[in-house]
C-alpha cells in the first residue's frame, strides 16, 4: 500500500474503484479527463433505496440524448443483444413492467412483490413511451440478435408463473402483448424502415450472446 501511495506501484482498477466509492473521489477529475467527445459507457450503479428513480433517471438520460440526435443525419444506433431491445418493447406497458419486475427480483437488495402488486409510476410509463418513440428517429439502426432472444423472454415469464409470482391471467396478457410485438417486428423487418422513414437493419445470429452491447 505504501509503495502505491508513493506512486511507485500503480493501483489496480478494482482498488481505484473501491477508493473512489469509499472516499467519494472522482477518478475523472483526478485524471483531468473530459468525456465530451468520447463514446459513453454506462456501468449501471444502482441506488437500491429508490429503484424507481434510478430507472427513471436512466431512461430520461437517454431520452435527452435521443432528442439531440433526432435531426442528425449521421446518427446511428447499434445493439448486439440476447434480449429484446428496450427501443422495441418499452412502448408495451406489460412487457416493460415485466423487465423491470425481473430486475427487481434478481436484485437481492430489493424486496420484490407479486407482479400484479408492482405499481409503476406514471412518469416512468411516460418516459418509456418517449424512449421508444424517439429512438425511432435515429437515422440508422442496426440490430444483431441472439437466436434465442424470444425464447429467453418466454422462459422467464414461465418461470415467474411457476413460482406463482405471475397469475395465469397476467401470463396470458403478457403473451398477447408479445404477439403484438412480434407482428410489429415482422413489419419492421419487411419494410426495413421505421414509421419515420429511418433505416433499420436486423440480423439474427446463430451464436448465443453472453450479454447485450450497444452504442
Language model features by range: what are they?
Residues 27, 52-55, 59-66, 174, ...:
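Generic structural signal of hydrophobic/aromatic residues within well-ordered alpha-helices
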Amino acid at each position: 500500500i505504501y509503495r502505491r501511495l508513493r506512486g511507485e506501484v500503480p493501483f489496480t482498477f478494482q482498488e481505484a474503484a473501491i477508493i473512489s466509492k469509499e472516499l467519494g473521489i472522482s477518478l475523472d477529475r483526478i485524471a483531468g479527463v473530459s468525456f465530451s467527445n468520447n463514446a459513453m459507457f454506462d456501468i449501471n450503479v444502482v441506488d437500491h433505496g429508490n429503484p424507481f428513480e434510478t430507472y427513471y433517471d436512466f431512461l430520461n438520460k437517454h431520452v435527452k440524448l435521443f432528442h439531440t440526435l433526432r435531426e442528425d443525419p449521421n446518427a446511428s444506433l447499434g445493439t448486439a443483444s440476447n434480449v429484446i431491445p428496450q427501443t422495441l418493447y418499452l412502448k408495451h406497458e406489460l412487457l416493460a413492467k415485466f423487465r423491470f419486475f425481473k430486475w427487481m427480483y434478481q436484485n437481492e437488495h430489493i424486496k420484490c412483490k407479486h407482479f400484479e402488486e408492482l405499481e409503476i409510476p406514471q412518469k416512468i410509463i411516460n418516459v418509456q413511451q418517449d424512449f421508444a418513440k424517439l429512438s425511432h428517429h435515429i437515422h440508422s439502426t442496426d440490430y444483431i440478435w441472439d437466436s434465442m432472444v424470444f425464447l429467453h423472454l418466454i422462459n422467464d415469464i414461465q418461470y415467474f408463473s411457476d413460482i406463482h409470482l405471475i397469475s395465469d391471467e397476467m401470463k396470458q396478457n403478457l403473451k398477447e402483448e408479445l404477439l403484438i410485438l412480434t407482428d410489429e417486428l415482422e413489419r419492421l423487418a419487411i419494410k426495413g424502415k421505421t414509421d419515420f422513414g429511418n433505416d433499420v437493419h436486423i440480423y439474427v445470429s446463430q451464436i448465443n450472446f453472453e450479454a447485450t452491447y450497444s452504442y
